[in-house]
A protein has these predicted regions:
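Short amphipathic, positively biased membrane-proximal segments
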Residues: 1-136
Length: 136
């Protein structure tokens, strides 16, 4: 049960920011992977703020989140990697749509997009950190 919740949680973080889940899930790995994943996550935080960034619910964005969610979900579920991967995908897809709805509603209310994006960054990072820390 604990692996299932962790997988859903890291998947949700991935749905908000694609590279946050993998960066957190594999932070303890050896080699250059962790640095590459962290750099990709930081790059995503910057790119997300650009007006030209496509919607996360477009096919490519959802596919990237599903793949990252699967890898991250499996990474935090050592006892049940396949179930972890499936739950990571579910969490990522659900959070992608919820995050997009949040941003649409914020825009409708004329809230500052940059501040809303930073809040979403903070939510993704906080969730990912919580999941990884609960894994130890």
């Amino acid at each position: 049960m604990k692996d299932a919740l962790r997988s859903l949680g890291i998947g949700a973080a991935t749905g908000l920011r694609t590279m946050t889940g993998p960066a957190a899930a594999f932070a303890a790995s050896s080699g250059n992977w962790r640095w590459l994943l962290r750099a990709a996550a930081v790059g995503e935080y910057v790119v997300d703020k650009l007006p030209s960034t496509p919607s996360r619910t477009q096919p490519f964005g959802l596919a990237a989140r599903a793949i990252a969610g699967a890898l991250s979900g499996a990474g935090v579920a050592p006892e049940s990697r396949y179930a972890g991967a499936a739950l990571g995908v579910a969490g990522a897809i659900a959070a992608a749509y919820l995050g997009a709805a949040y941003r649409r509603e914020a825009a409708r209310r004329k809230l500052p997009d940059f501040a809303c994006a930073l809040l979403e960054d903070a939510a993704a990072i906080t969730l990912a950190r919580y999941v990884v820390r609960s894994n130890s």
